[in-house]
């Protein structure tokens, strides 16, 4: 149904664009962005060279957004369309199929950034029935100041490549903004590096990258809405969990109702605060001078109410134990003798990718997640295991061909 609605919107947009296809009279670029962080970062880089438009305003859930015909028309009439990642704006891949690439340049803000595995997010405070939404990969990279810098850098480089006559301006604007983000990053590093409590509990599981980059552990909690009190049964469960783990604060993505705060405080002693996922910024907040940096500063202040207090590591309320082969689960029927034909194909050695830095993000993640080795130690470890002078292996039904330095040797496999 979503694909059909997007197709109809695209068809309608063709007519709308035909009627409104006029470039900016002031000679500026016309850039359309999806949601707030992308808008803010693009605006900071483009500066006075462009009119930057925000597609998804406050009050609209970016995860659930589907573009109208009017929205598609805006994108198709733009010089550049900037989005964050297809795991956030799930409608974008379908849109790009019908977009005139010669006319509209597109920028994926995350570029080739490696994303963490995603999962189910439960946000019962929204108007979509509390069903949550699933990401194959977690797109919330903007909530780590360190990664926000990388988003800005990629937007800068992409705009510079597309509009080389404006490259100097883009670089100057980006440098000024990145300097502010670096101050923010340092504030997070200094404020959280000596955290007495490394775990924090949140109703919106959007802070994985923030936790990863600053040495914390996000623990998400389900069954809580900021504007409704939990059932008696759920309240009993929460009371036991909160007291067992000595939880002082639970973070919501928006201000919780006073009734909920009073109920939880009375039953458990826990306090409620806000960690803003910055998916949007209200007009009122903008008028008050709020922006990405000021909101992230407030998030840090809120986090420190937990991290500055001594406390035990907080365990997840419900430990997930998915039965997958990766986790050591398989049926006897899954075990079978395999023939060479099961592996037919042209296989590439991963060693060159290790050497050229392609895997560096993987080693960085692994180092932060496990704490067992540094990223450089992981790279050295895998270099030793993966090193080979065979660049390719080509497999047919019963032959294996090893390619090495432009020469190849073929062998027949006997089962």
Q: What are the residue ranges of the model-derived segments?
A:
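Amphipathic/hydrophobic helical signal segments and adjacent flexible N-terminal regions
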Residues: 318-373
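Positively charged n-region of N-terminal signal peptides that target proteins for export
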Residues: 1-8
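Extracytoplasmic metal-acquisition and chelation regions
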Residues: 5, 19-330, 334, 346
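Contiguous, well-ordered beta-strand patches that form the walls/edges
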Residues: 377-415
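Beta-strand cores of secreted/periplasmic/IMS beta-sandwich domains, seen most often
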Residues: 82-84, 341, 346-352, 392-401
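Pocket-lining segment of extracytoplasmic ligand-binding domains
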Residues: 206, 224, 368-384
